[in-house]
Amino acid sequence: MRCAWLVLFFLACGAPVVPDAGPSGGGQLASDAGGPTDAGLTTDAGSVTDAGSTNDAGTTDAGGITTVLRVTYTAGAHTLFVRGSLPPLNWNTGVPMVKENDTTWSISLTGLAAGAALEWKPVLNDATWSKGPNYRAAGSSTVEVAPRFVRDAGEWSRRWPSFTSTLLMNTRGVYVYLPPTYLENSTASMPVVYMHDGQNLFDPAAAFGGVTWRVPESMNDAASSGRFREAIVIGVENAGGARIAEYTPTVDTSVGGGGRGDLYLRMLVEELKPMVDSSFRTRSGPRDTVLIGSSLGGLISSYAGISGAGTFGCIGAMSPSVWWDNRVLLARLSQSGATRPALVYVDSGDSGPSNDGVGNTADLAAAYRALGYVEGSTLKYVVQQGATHTESAWASRLPGALEFLLGPAR
C-alpha cells in the first residue's frame, strides 16, 4: 500500500541571480572526475549588471567588518575572480582572488557595513560565471563554497545491480544519483538522501505503472535554482516479496507478516552506508543523512528516526502506513528516548481509498509535536488536497520535502 502528499511553497532567491543554462537530462553515471576543460568555458552574457558600482581591488572604510570568501575548485591554469553586489565588488568586473593552493582561492573584503548582506559569485577567468544561484555572505565571517562552472545536470545509474546483504541474506539493486557540482568539482562533498523503493525513483521501465518519482529532474532543477542543497541520492530497491516484512517494525497479525524492519535498517546502516561513504565524497553526519519513503516506506522511515544510533537525522514520511499493527508507530514515538531526528517531514493526500490515511497521518504529526517538534522549524506537515496514494503524487511533493530536509542552497 502507498500514500500521497503535498508541498505548498518553496523559497525564492530574493536577489538577482546570474542566469545560466537550465538543467539538461542526466544520463548514465560517469566517472568521478572534476575540473573544466577549455572547450567547456563560455562567457555568460546575461550577467547581472550594477551601473552604480566600480571595480576596486583594494579595501574601503577600515571601520567596517571583514568577510573572507573562500572558493575550493581545481582551476588548473585558469584564474578565479569574484563579482558581487556591494563594494569593493560589483557585477560588471571581477576582482581577482588569491590562490592559496591548487584547490583553494580566497579574498578578504574589508569595510563592509555591519549587517550588510553581500550577494556574490565566483567567475572563472572573469568570463564564466558559476552555475546556480548567487552565494550570500553577511557579517564578519568566512564563507567557503565549492562551485561549478560547466555542468548543468547530474547523472544516475543502477550503480550496484546486485548488492548482497549478509544480514538479510538477499540481493537487490541500488541506484545512485550524483549531482552536477559533485561531478565537476573534485573538492565538493555532499549530503546523502537514502530512499526506499528504488525501482520507482529513476527509471520508468522499472517503476510501478511506469511512473517514477522524477528524482533526477527534481535534483537537477534544484541545482539550477538553489531551492535546496545538491545531494547524492541512493535509491534502494525493495526486495519484492520481502518488502512488507522489511518495511515494518513489528508483526501485524491482521496482515499475517512483517517484523524485519530492524534488520532492514541495520542493513542500511551497517552494510550499505559504509559502502556509500567509502565510494563517494559524502557528508556522513546525521544532519546530512536523509531517509525518505512512502507508504510502508514512510512507516519504516519514521521508525528509523527513533531507533538505532541516530544515523538518519532528517526523516521524510510520505503517506506513511501509520495503521500498521494497531498504530504501533505512535506508541513507539511516545516511548522514544534520546534518539530523535533533527527534522521530520510528514505528509499525505486526502482522496482515494481511506483518504490516503490522512487521519492517521495527522495523528503522527501531532505525536511529533507532543515530543517538542515545532511546525515550520523542526517539523513540516503537509496535506495535498485531492491527492491519492500514487507515485505521481509523491513525485509532485518530493521537492518540497527535500527543501525542508536539506535546506536551501546558500
Regions found by a protein language model. Name each.
Residues 1-11:
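Sec-dependent bacterial lipoprotein signal peptides
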Residues 5-6, 127-128, 351-353:
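Short Gly/Pro-enriched loop/turn and capping motifs at secondary-structure junctions
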Residues 10-64:
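Ser/Thr-rich, Pro/Gly/Ala-heavy low-complexity intrinsically disordered linkers and tails
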Residues 21, 57, 138-154:
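Extracellular beta-sheet/turn segments enriched in Thr/Pro/Gly and aliphatic residues
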Residues 65-73:
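A short, amphipathic beta-strand motif
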Residues 73-117, 124-142:
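Aromatic-rich carbohydrate-binding modules that target alpha-glucans
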Residues 76-87, 100-107, 150-410:
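Non-catalytic cap/lid and distal C-terminal segments of serine-dependent acyl enzymes
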Residues 115-116, 121-123, 176-177, 186:
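N-terminal carbohydrate-binding/catalytic regions of secreted carbohydrate-active enzymes
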